[in-house]
Curated annotation (Swiss-Prot):
Signal peptide range: none
Protein name: Large ribosomal subunit protein uL16
Organism of provenance: Desulfotalea psychrophila (strain LSv54 / DSM 12343)
InterPro entries, per database record: Ribosomal_uL16 (IPR047873), Ribosomal_uL16_bact-type (IPR000114), Ribosomal_uL16_CS (IPR020798), Ribosomal_uL16_dom (IPR016180), Ribosomal_uL16_sf (IPR036920)
UniProt-listed SUPFAM superfamilies: Ribosomal protein L16p/L10e
Keywords: Ribonucleoprotein, Ribosomal protein, RNA-binding, rRNA-binding, tRNA-binding
Encoding gene (name): rplP
CDD domains, per the entry: Ribosomal_L16_L10e (cd01433)
Lineage: Bacteria, Pseudomonadati, Thermodesulfobacteriota, Desulfobulbia, Desulfobulbales
HAMAP family recorded: Ribosomal_uL16 (MF_01342)
Amino acid sequence: MLSPKKVKHRKVFKGRMRGAAHRGSSLAFGDYALKALSCGTMTARQIEAARITINRTMKRGGQVWIRVFPDKPLTKKPAETRMGKGKGSPESWVAIVKPGRLLYEVAGVSEDVAIKALSLASNKLPFPCKVVTRRTTL
C-alpha cells in the first residue's frame, strides 16, 4: 500500500474540503485521465484497487500514472472504547481529493480501451468521476 516514508507529525487535524483543485487539474503525462467531480478521500487501498483494474483492462499495454498520494493519516480508536482519553492511533493513509483533480492518467492504448479502463476504475472510488481526453481539455 502507498504511505509516506517519513512524516513530521503522526496525527493531523481533520480539516475541511472546500473549493476546487488548483494543482493537478490538467493533463501532464498521458492522453486520457480520470477526473474527480466532487470532493472526498481516497484510501491507499482504493488507489491500489483502481490501479490494478486499469492495468488488467489494458492488459499491461500502455502506461499508467497515479496523480494522487495518500499523505494524510486517518486515526481510529479501538473497538468498545469509551469516548475521550485522547485521539486514536493512526490506522490508514488517505489522499484528499477536490473537484477537478486528475487521479490517473493513461497513454499508449487506443481510446476505447483507455475509456473502458478508466470508467471501470471509477467504480472502485467513493465519489463520482469522469474520463477526460487531451482533446476535451484543450
